[in-house]
Amino acid sequence: MSVSYFQERGTPASGDVLSPATTSLGGASRGANALSSRITSVLSASYADLEIRDALETLDTRGVRNTAETRRQIRLDVQKEVIECNGEIVKDFGQVAEQLKRIGTAISSLNSYCADMRSHIAAANKETGPVLEEATGLINQRKQVESKQQILQAFNSHFLISDEEATVLTSTAEPVNEEFFQVLTRVKKIHHDCQVLLGTEDQRLGLEILEQSSKQLNAAFQKLYRWIQREFKTLDLENPQISASVRRSLRVLAERPTLFQSCLDSFAEARESILSDSFHSALTGSASDAEHIATKPIEFQAHDPLRYVGDMLAWVHSTTVSEREALENLFISDGDEIKRSIQEGLESEPWLKDEEAEIFDGRKALSQLVGRDLASVARVLRQRTEQVVQSHDDATLAYKIANLIGFYKGMFAKLLGTDSDVLEVFTTLEASAMRQFRANMRDYVAAVQSDIAVPPQDLSPPDFLDDALQTLKVLAKSYDTSSAGAEDQEQGFQAVLAEALDPFMSGCVNLQKGLQQPDSAVFAINCLFAAKDVLSAFTFASERVEEMEDTISEQVAQLVDYQHEYLLHESGLATLLEALEPITDDEESLKTIPELEPFKRDALVAASQQLDEFLPSALIDAAENLKRLKNRKMIQDITEEAAASFCEDFEVVESKIIAADDLTYDEDKEDEEQEPGLRDLFPRTSGEIRVLLS
């Protein structure tokens, strides 16, 4: 529609330009240029221009048709509409102006009212200002007073205790109960918190409260100390349900190491007396209570020294275990509380602290306390045990008692530690029993040595050695029982061997010196085998057994040499070997063999006959030399070894004879013409010898 619009408008325009009724040429030219510019401007406008698009859309909504009338009136219609719209706007603004006038009037009225109110308020402020200032001051003062009152109440509740609480804390008429410990804990906190007050400029208040709390604490600990003392007098350690208040009291009292130690001292004295009486009752059966009626007194076993000492040691050990368990329940059931309390006490009483002292060890202190409780019992045990040991001259009994004491000593070391005074008593008793054992053994050895004359005819171990070995066997069994599991078990038995075996073996050596071979070696081996048989049953004597085996081997070697020499001399082979010693393997030396005296015809024939006569019974005759040796297999082994050496010597003689015959044999002569050779005179071969001696 817009295209047709521009075309229809262009037609009359063109007509107007060509019309003769137009104005002058200049005016027509300007009009044509203006129209041309207008048309050009319109045609150059883009249809995408928003203004043109809006204008076209407005025309479309009005339903305008493209007619000549419409084109003439459209401008006027638009201007008319604009004027009408402007009129309506002016009318509306007139109403707004009227309303603004009314609002202005209202505002003026309000301003007037506000001015009046300001004047009234200013007058009221002027009249009430001093009253408000005074009220504000009073309110601030009230807040300060309330704040001070709260501070005072907080201070009193924190740093002061009531008279009732002070009575509970310090009065001996009041019981030691949960309330006492609560008040005590509070006073300790007050005492500790006084450090804050001492840090202020005015320390007077802090010093006064510190002094007051110190007095209250001292009085409380004194009350607690006396209460514990009373409780200890009636305390039954055998009762597993020990009062929890006693344990708690001890833990708290530990904060005062001096009082705590004093309490322990009195407790130890009381327990020492009680345990001493109990031990005396167990020994004599003098107890009046029903607990010991069914138990026989230990002294009923006095006729059996070992059982008597064992029963006493068993009673002491059982009592020690019970005492330690009871004291653990009393002092250590709460863990390390007592240790921490003592450390706190030492910090609060630094003058009691030794710089070189070890850190408090609860277990060690407990062991020391148990040791103190058993001091009197240990003294009685020592007296009675020493009396038993010294009143018997039986070395075996003394050693068994020493081993028994050593066994219990190890158990007490685990219970009380190696530094316990009770352990020193056991060490002394063990040493005393061992001294008695050594003294008894030396007396016995001296008595035996005075009776020693000659060894038995059958070269068997002498009676004193048999008796000593029986005693040694008993001692070894006792040692094995008492020292089971000990690391130095073998080393510890050396002292027993030195006293119970070595002197008797030395006596056997002295007897051996008066014997000739083979009796000397046979006697030594018999004695060594007897001792070895006893010691082999005990692993802790393995070193001594090895030494004996080495000595037996040396003696066996001597017997082998003796048997070897016997075979050589009895067979006549010794003479031949002696003659062949200077002969070497060169031909000249070998040729001289027939000229040697033992190898001459008659002598060699005699030697051959002697050998033939010896061989059938050689082994029997040789074994007869060792018939008193107790080990039959050893007799056979020694003889066979000597026979083997004899065969080797015979092979030497045989080889020399054969070599000499080979050098003297004349191949040019007939066999009948040859002189008899050495081999012919001495026909035995090494093979035959080995068969006959096997």
From Swiss-Prot:
What Gene Ontology terms for biological process does this UniProt record contain? intra-Golgi vesicle-mediated transport; protein transport
| Protein localization | Golgi apparatus membrane
Membrane disposition: Peripheral membrane protein
Listed Pfam families: COG6_C (PF20653), COG6_N (PF06419)
Region ranges (Disordered) = 1-20
Q: Name one GO cellular component term.
A: Golgi membrane
Keyword vocabulary terms for this entry = Golgi apparatus, Membrane, Protein transport, Transport
For this chain, the family text in UniProt reads: Belongs to the COG6 family.
> What functional role does this protein have?
Acts as a component of the peripheral membrane COG complex that is involved in intra-Golgi protein trafficking. COG is located at the cis-Golgi, and regulates tethering of retrograde intra-Golgi vesicles and possibly a number of other membrane trafficking events.
What protein name applies here?
Answer: Conserved oligomeric Golgi complex subunit 6
Q: What is the protein's species of origin?
A: Phaeosphaeria nodorum (strain SN15 / ATCC MYA-4574 / FGSC 10173) (Glume blotch fungus)
Name the gene: COG6
